[in-house]
Structures are given as C-alpha cells and as structure tokens.
C-alpha cells in the first residue's frame, strides 16, 4: 500500500473507514422565556457513592441527579468518576463540571436582555463520561438522555464539557 501510494498508484486501505451518523442540528428554542433547561455534563460528577456504578474509562452509563433546592454544587454530596483529567479540582468544587452556581445567578437575574431569560431549570442534572468510550455506546447514551429529556418536557440543555 505504501509503495502504491508513493508511486501515485491507486491503493485500497487495509482499515475500513467508519462513516458516522449525521446528527441534524436541533431547531432554536422558539420562546426562551418559557423554556425549561437542563444541565448535562461529561465531567463524571455523580451522587456520592457512585450509585449508577460509572466506570472511570469506557463508561456506558448515564445518570440523573437531583439539584432541587441547591444554590450550588458545594451544597450537595458528590463524587467524580473520570480518568481523563485530574479530578482533584472537580472534587473540591463540582461547580466546575456542573455550573449550578452560575446558572442560579443567571436564572435569578432580572437584568438579562429579553430573549436571554429562561423559565426554569430542570431540578436534575444529567451526567456521563466519554473518556475511552466506544462511539456506538456514546451514541446510545446520548439518545437515551435525549429521550428522557423530551419525555420530561425539557426544551434545551446547557452542555458542559471537560
């Protein structure tokens, strides 16, 4: 194959190229001031004790954890399950991965421009990790999360990546 390529001859690769499914862009939210938003994170923040048994690498699960009544993530009890970054800082302040402190400030602000306000924050956040994940498994996780959000009447999401 190398010799053919160097000689400008046709060649066939020994490794098949994977064609990814194209995901269409979602339409804009028509009326943000009536919208319910959810927080989604890939930081691996989970409820204390890791009740959904996330794996630090090649995780195939997602979880949904209550933030009802919390002003920020430091008020809750959380663990971080992720091997793609140093979790020391996230364990010290989970707001880095689930920016509840900032979203609550945004939610309460009366000074936002029209069209930037939203009606409410969904009282749970969604979490998973993608480090070392197989694409098909991550697509499955994403589809399950999206179906759950749709069934809960969530209009949009704030996706926090690590």
Q: Where are the regions a protein language model picked out?
A:
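An N-terminal assembly and electron-transfer interface module characteristic of large anaerobic redox
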Residues: 1-162
């Amino acid at each position: 194959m190398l010799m053919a390529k160097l000689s400008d001859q046709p060649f066939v690769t020994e490794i098949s190229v994977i064609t990814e499914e194209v995901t269409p862009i979602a339409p804009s939210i028509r009326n943000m001031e009536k919208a319910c938003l959810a927080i989604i994170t890939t930081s691996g923040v989970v409820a204390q004790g890791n009740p959904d048994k996330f794996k630090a690498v090649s995780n195939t699960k997602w979880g949904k954890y209550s933030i009802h009544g919390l002003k920020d993530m430091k008020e809750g009890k959380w663990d971080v399950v992720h091997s793609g970054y140093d979790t020391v800082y996230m364990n010290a302040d989970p707001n880095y991965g689930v920016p509840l402190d900032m979203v609550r400030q945004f939610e309460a602000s009366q000074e936002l421009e029209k069209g930037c306000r939203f009606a409410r924050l969904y009282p749970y956040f969604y979490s998973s990790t993608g480090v070392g994940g197989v694409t098909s498994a991550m697509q499955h996780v994403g589809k399950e999360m999206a179906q759950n959000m749709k069934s809960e009447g969530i209009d949009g999401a704030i996706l926090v990546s690590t």
